[in-house]
Structures are given as structure tokens and as C-alpha cells.
Amino acid sequence: MSVITYREALRQAIDEEMSRDERVFLLGEEVGQYNGAYKVSMGLLEKYGEERVKDTPITELGFTGLAVGAAMAGLRPICEWMTFNFGILALDQVVNNAAKMRHMSGGQFNVPMVIRGPNGPAEFLSSQHSQSLTAYFTHVPGLKVIAPATPYDAKGLLKSAIRDDNPVIFLEGELMYAWKGEVPDQEYTIPIGEADIKRKGRDVSIVTFSKPLKIVEEAAEELAKEGIDAEVVDLRSLKPLDEKSIYSSVAKTNRCVVVDESWPVNSFGSYVAWLVSKNCFDDLDAPVELVSSEDVPMPYNHSLELAVQPSVEKIMAAAKKVLYI
């Protein structure tokens, strides 16, 4: 096992899959000569050349459409959006072409492509560059959506995403790229659609995904000091969703808190909370709590920026609420 950063784990996954399959190529803004906006693609241009590591203009709609066409023609593009905030410009290609092509063609066309890049709040990026747009993509039939929070999960799931014959949305985060964790030296993959219990507990299930995992684990440690044993369920894959792991955890703890850094209305977290409320009704000893960002545009002021997002304190308060403490 080696300890590497999240960005290094992504780079290893891309490098290994490009070496394994000559149909795999990378395209996006600054992925080549600049080594990626977040240095994920460091060294790949030198290794694979301009035919397989392609810098693009600042036109998400255009190069995402190029990736869709390349996938339909038999290649396996990895399309990097510098940020998912910019990806809104490419929604037509994602929603109306990539997601629907297999269905509309009666299975004659596959669209084996990955769209990856940072999603969600970062720091000092204000309203237009610090948004969690997860639900935009989980809402669309035909897309798979993955949101890993550790280097181990990121590498294993990205390799699986690249090998998948369907369009996969791969959600990362600016603040996660420097996170470190253990990653096996030997090759491995992680199946899409499997959650992971990051911490076992008996008193309350805290369900989350992506960047909030870190503060959820911190909250669980603080709760443990007060005698509250929280189980942490990391979804990792949002679509397909591992409902069985969620329900098994709630059946054990009888209480559930969902943490999602998106806005609360129609968020993926609110969908998970609804699923638990509906399917675990007889197991629940308290209503499900949702900890989300506030329903406001992201402020630029750092104190306000932190105030509108989920926090350790908010998660602990929600856990205590479902425990009637």
C-alpha cells in the first residue's frame, strides 16, 4: 500500500487505463500542456502525445459533444470539465445525447464515456463557481453517477467508470485533490453501485457521499466522546444506488441522518431521506434528518461561506435530534 493524494489516485487510474486500452483518451481545458487545472493529468501529454491528450477551447458544449461522438464511434473518452459549474453549458449534450443514445437507438449505439471534474463548494469562489450540481445529473435516466471521497475509492471507481459501456458522471472536488489515503500498489477496481461502511456503529446511521464524508467522520468521532456510536455510510455510487446497504444500516440503528452539501430542495440527499422514510418506516424511531447547504447562493465572505454549508456541529446536532438528546 502507498499513501498518495486524491489527484494522484485519479492520475494513476487514467494512466493505467490509457496503457491498457488504446481507445481511451483524455480531453478538456488545459489537460495537456498545463497538466490539468488541478494537475490530475500531470505528465500524460508527454507519455501519450497530442492524439490522446487533447487540449480544448473553453467551450464545454462543443468538446462534450465531440466526446459523445467519439464514444459512439467506438472510442472511450474521458472528458474533463474544469468545474461542473461550467458543465451547465454542456447539459444538452449530456441529457439529450449521451444519456439517451442507447435507448433511442434500440441498443445499436453505446456511449462509453466519463465526464469528470470538481463539483460542489470550495473556498472563496462565490456564487457561480461553488455549487453542488449533483441532482442535475442523478435526475437523468441513462447516466451513472459516482462521487468517491477517498483516494482508494477514487482510483478503483474511475477505472470501473472508464471500462463501463455507459456514460458516467464522476464527481470530484477542488478541496479533495490534496487529501491523502492508502491505495494498493497492485491493480484493482471497485464495482459501481456499492456503498461502503466507513465506520460501524449502533446508535445512528449517517449517510453521505463525496467531500462531506470528512466532516461526517469528524462528527462521528466527536459523538463517540459523548457516548453516541454513529455508523457512517459512504454511498460512493449515487446511480446506481446501493439501497440495501442504507436500509441494513438503518434497520440496525433505527435512526438516520443524511448529509449532502447541495441545496436542500430536490437534492440527492433529500431523495435518500425520502427513500429511508418510505422503505424503513417500521424500523425508524425518529424522522430522518437532512443536513444540507442553506437554500441561498454561495457567499464570498469566508465566514458566511462556512455558515451556509454542512458542518461538524450541524451534523452532531442532527444526530442528537434523532436520538432525542
Outline where the language-model segments fall:
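Thiamine diphosphate
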Residues: M1-P167, L171, L306, ...
